[in-house]
Amino acid sequence: MKTRNWLKVVEKPLEPGIPNSPKAITESKDIPGEIRMFRGTTSLAYGIDEITEAICEPKARMNWVERMTENILIEGKPNQGKWLSYESYGLSWPISVRDYVFQQTLEKSMYEQKNKTIVKVSSIEHPDYPEKTDRVRGELPTCVFTLEAASEKETHLDVMVQVDPGGSIPGFLKNMIQKGWALKTMRALNGYLKNH
């Protein structure tokens, strides 16, 4: 599969109106025949473990992930390195509620003598969570949060996603909807960390 290079979509302050706020950069990559991929990068003024917990723990995610209405841990636990979850998202009319079943993994390592954490999320099927008639099952081929500690209180974040919300939404509209995902995600995560 041939892919094109990442193209910058936007560069904005992570915290609008705050002097010297880190930049939040959003990029996109077209993959022929597939939904566009989006990536965001920034620096967060929090330790790597604190950010990892906010990204992984279902109760924390309910407080910052946009439009999330359910986050059910099916099996495993984030601190065990692998877990399965069911998530649903309430969207604005006329778009139906979307739901997903995910496998998530957490890997910690050292990279150039600094802590590194990678959280990978992808869609799976699970017999206890079949598709529901009142929801549209989305597909998440890939979502990766890569965290690299710059210091005890600063972490570089790179988040990449390719998601198909499913249903009858045309591909170009799906790409338009997802265009702002990375910036919203980085800002929401930072806002949660700032207030918790």
Model-derived features with residue positions:
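Eukaryotic helix-grip
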Residues: 1-196
